Amino acid sequence: MAPIRPKYISFDCYGTLINFDMAGAARDLYGDRLDAQAMDKFIRNFSAYRLDEIMGAWKPYADVVHNSLSRACKANGVTFKDEDAQMVYERVPTWGPHPDVPAGLAKVAKEIPLVILSNAMNAQIMSNVEKLGAPFHKVYTAEQAQAYKPRFQAFEYMFDMLGCGPEDMLHVSSSFRYDLMSAHDLGIKNKVWVNRGHEPANPYYGYTEIADISGLPGVVGL
């Protein structure tokens, strides 16, 4: 396959670059109240409710976490406390990258401008970005776009801010549901799926698969 050389490479941040450990936070809160099987179900519910919470009008991510955690607790017969949701939210900016990320990003950043499009709050995202070990041309948040991915509005905001179109981008994500399905529908032909085990492969959406970010330089011929 010929190398892809886009004008920009855009990335999902949480999960793809940052080790987004919502599951670990939930285990810390409720692991002593739920057995292993019930805890796994709780984590699946918490993840599903987070996706559901971002589908409508934009709201602060603290509210997304609060509502989705509350719903997961209700579904699993666990007592919910407001302070538990606040604890989870405050952990987000403390999380760092997957081990493969800094070296792979740094190599690509020397040749192609890197962009983040993240379901993040302005007050939190730079604490994560600073841990990535590579320079970013631009960092765009759901708060700025007033929409969370997978809503098209988030991607369209990025296009408008960069002054480019889908044909100019290579979009990189570990998630089909949040990123790659929307990228496909919006005409981003060049996509990379980072297989971090979050979701199963879905070849319909047309992408290059890599195991981790160390494989990205090869995709763009570096």
Label each PLM-derived region with a short phrase.
Residues 1-9, 102, 106, 115-222:
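Asp-based, Mg2+/Mn2+-dependent phosphohydrolase catalytic module
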